[in-house]
Amino acid sequence: MNIKHNYISYFQMNGIQIPGISNPEAIIPITGEKKSYKLVLDFNDGAISIIEARYLDSKLHREIQDLSDNDVTILGTEISDGAYDENLDIHCDKCNKFYRPYCRLHPLFKIPDRVLKRDESSNLSFSQQTLPILFRIEESKLPNAGLGVIAEVFIPVGMVFGPYKGRRCQKKTDFYKDGYAWLIKSGDKRFYIDGSDAERSNWLRYINSPRFEDEQNMLAFQTNGKIFYRVIKPIRINQELLVWYGSSYGNEFVESENGNKYKKPAKNPFICVGAQR
């Protein structure tokens, strides 16, 4: 499979979407401003990166889009813990700091769901039909995990997917089924997004939870009252996407591959309390 062709074709069809100030789904406009930077796939780091255009190397980078000087200038403002605003700021798991709108050294790049009308003739559920062409859904190799999401192409660190979709519920007793809901905390408001109904959710509902810390390659975070998933480890072709669904992330013990139990890192303000899968 031609990775370059896949990426470029996908970007041309869907546009470039990167979380931005006040709107994690904002599209960076193509303007007449000076463009001294490039958004690239960095082969060395296996990650989305921002570099100066003069340093672009076809052997090291796959170019995605030009970025204007103004676009880059607004990135990476460090925010103290006390000044954090969930509608403006995103926590960088690499730097362990808050940035507005996100970290410039470890930028985010949003891939949208496949947009379509409900097809009554399709054998696939609506949530399965929202799957981007970068993935496929098939039986997971994890024991008793059911269906899972598998990468068709290399997926770099920094890619963002979402938001997680489903029914908005006020209490757990409203869930259709356990294991598919995230708790959203926004100021004094608390509510759940229940993705158990495959006809009212999206493809993110099929992403399974890892058995061990080392298996996790995605991280869930909340911004603007919505849940997004971001890639924190490079995902190879035919590798399954895995995100932690702990009922009390940061406080519960998890088991490593060697059988030892330890506590997960406590600081991750964007992980929401979700029902375990």
From Swiss-Prot:
GO terms assigned for molecular function: histone H3K4 methyltransferase activity; histone H3K4 monomethyltransferase activity
Subcellular location: Nucleus
Gene3D superfamilies according to UniProt: SET domain
One Gene Ontology cellular component: nucleus
UniProt keyword annotation of Methyltransferase present: yes
Free-text tissue specificity from the UniProt record: Expressed in the germline. Predominantly expressed in primary spermatocytes. Also expressed in the oocyte-producing germline of hermaphrodites.
SMART domains found in the cross-reference section: SET
Keyword Methyltransferase belongs to the record: yes
UniProt domain SET: residue ranges: 135-246
Main subcellular location of this protein, as a coarse class: nucleus
Keywords recorded for this protein, A-Z: Methyltransferase, Nucleus, S-adenosyl-L-methionine, Transferase
EC numbers for this chain: 2.1.1.-, 2.1.1.364
Catalytic reactions on record: N(6)-methyl-L-lysyl(4)-[histone H3] + S-adenosyl-L-methionine = N(6),N(6)-dimethyl-L-lysyl(4)-[histone H3] + S-adenosyl-L-homocysteine + H(+); L-lysyl(4)-[histone H3] + S-adenosyl-L-methionine = N(6)-methyl-L-lysyl(4)-[histone H3] + S-adenosyl-L-homocysteine + H(+)
Binding positions for S-adenosyl-L-methionine per the UniProt entry: 245
InterPro entries: PRDM7_9_PR-SET (IPR044417), SET_dom (IPR001214), SET_dom_sf (IPR046341), TR-Histone_Methyltrans (IPR052296)
UniProt record, GO biological process: methylation
Effects seen without this gene: RNAi-mediated knockdown partially suppresses the sterility of spr-5 mutants (by101) and results in a slightly increased number of eggs laid as compared to the spr-5 single mutant.
Described purpose of this protein according to its UniProt entry: Histone methyltransferase that specifically mono- and di-methylates 'Lys-4' of histone H3 in vitro. Does not tri-methylate 'Lys-4' of histone H3 in vitro. Promotes spermatid development and fertility by positively regulating the transcription of spermatocyte-specific genes in primary spermatocytes. Together with spr-5, required for transgenerational fertility.
Similarity section: Belongs to the class V-like SAM-binding methyltransferase superfamily.
Protein name: Histone-lysine N-methyltransferase set-17
Organism of derivation: Caenorhabditis elegans
